[in-house]
Amino acid sequence: MANILILGAGSIGTAFSFPCSDKNNSVTIIGTHLENNFIDQINSKRIHPVLKCNVPKNVQFLKFNKLSETINKKADLIVVAVSSKGIEWASTELSKVLKINTPIIILTKGLAIHNNNYEVLAHKMERLFNKNGIKQTNISAVGGPCLAKGLANRVHTSVVFANSDIKIVNQIAQLVSTDYYHVFTSDDVVGVETCAAIKNIFSMALGASEGLCNSNVTKEIREKNYLNTAAALLQQSIIEMGTFTEKLRGK
């Protein structure tokens, strides 16, 4: 059993607490400085206002002012579940209280820009920690797809945990893998984060495959025969994700 601290009480942070809790870990969710009222709502009814489901009974929800105290009680794993815009804030706040080499895993998806180049969020957080005087960091990333409501309802979900030291993500995977939350591991942080960030662009194209298949045929034909186009778009999506990953020096 591990002590897992999740920073961010939103949909994905709370959903991630389900497999963590089901694996008999001690789980604490700390809301951000903007989520104090949100934490009160959850604690009053034990229902997440966005996910619309009961939260696990053994998951503790605390306000942001408890962050330092909770980490000092020994957090074995810190999970960052804030928005991509909140990564800088989270890095700053964690820098104030972080113990050396405490494992961190980021649920947040996205790419940042630094010095006119793309930067994956794990590398951004490492850079910000270094800037704030934390020289030794241990940051992993998560690639999906993983919709929060699906995970909170314990449907089969497959994800990838990535760290340049694969032993670290193998250990984290053992902590949270369940019979419905299936974790693969990779040492390609750039590749996993890049594909996780851009996959939704391609998923929109796949979702539009019926309309894109051929504008010169009837709607009935499109409805029955769009799968060729969907398959072609899927193939092109994989090619382009590979090209983008290579450009960012992933594997």
Over which residues does each language-model region extend?
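Nucleotide donor/acceptor-binding cores
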Residues: A2-N3, T102, T157
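Rossmann-like NAD(P)(H) cofactor-binding subdomain of soluble oxidoreductases
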Residues: K57, F61-S68, N72-R154, I172
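Short, charged helix-to-loop "capping" segments that act as catalytic/coupling loops
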Residues: G31-I39, N65-K74, G110-Y118, E210-K219, ...
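Internal alpha-helical scaffold of NAD(P)-dependent oxidoreductase catalytic cores
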Residues: V97, K131-N138, H156-K251
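NAD(P)+-binding Rossmann beta1-loop-alpha1 motif at the extreme N-terminus of oxidoreductases
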Residues: M1-N54, V59-K63, H114
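Conserved hydrophobic residues forming the short capping helix/wall of the S-adenosyl-L-methionine
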Residues: R46, M125-F129, T245
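Short beta-strand/turn micro-motifs composed of small residues
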Residues: G8, I30-G31, V82, T108, ...
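Electropositive phosphate-/nucleotide-binding environments in soluble metabolic enzymes
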Residues: G10, T14, T32, N36, ...
